[in-house]
Amino acid sequence: MSQLTYLFRSAPHGSAAGREGVDALLAASAYCEDITVIFIGDGVYQLLLGQEPSGILSKDYAPMLKLFDLYDIEQVFVCSESLAQRGLAQADLVIDAQALSLEQVKEKLQQAGKLLSF
């Protein structure tokens, strides 16, 4: 069972939810070693390479995603169906994330101790 599961399901830059979620995730990693991160639905866009949010006066927080390794956040997953529905592939992502089927994502969510959704 994962003690903390962070579920990213909203698109980036339309609101501060994604950035705040990444901030919370990195902060929590100092206190908790058992963290799972899942990107599903429009949340997969947060992992997309080549974003230029400065055009809409938004902060680019994609470099913060690359800190996951440094913070020992190793359980990072992306829903393969969400990628396919949006015409994306894992090569389009800014970080390596293990692809899971929707059914496998549901299993991970059922195993979550605490779930934080952004």
UniProtKB/Swiss-Prot annotation:
Key word Manganese present: no
UniProt keywords, alphabetically: Cytoplasm
GO cellular component: cytoplasm
Compartments where located: Cytoplasm
The keyword Lipid biosynthesis is annotated on this UniProt entry: no
Coiled-coil segments on the chain, per record: none
Family assignment from sequence similarity: Belongs to the DsrF/TusC family.
Function: Could be part of a sulfur-relay system.
Identification of the protein by name: Protein TusC homolog
Lineage: Bacteria, Pseudomonadati, Pseudomonadota, Gammaproteobacteria, Vibrionales
The gene coding this protein: tusC
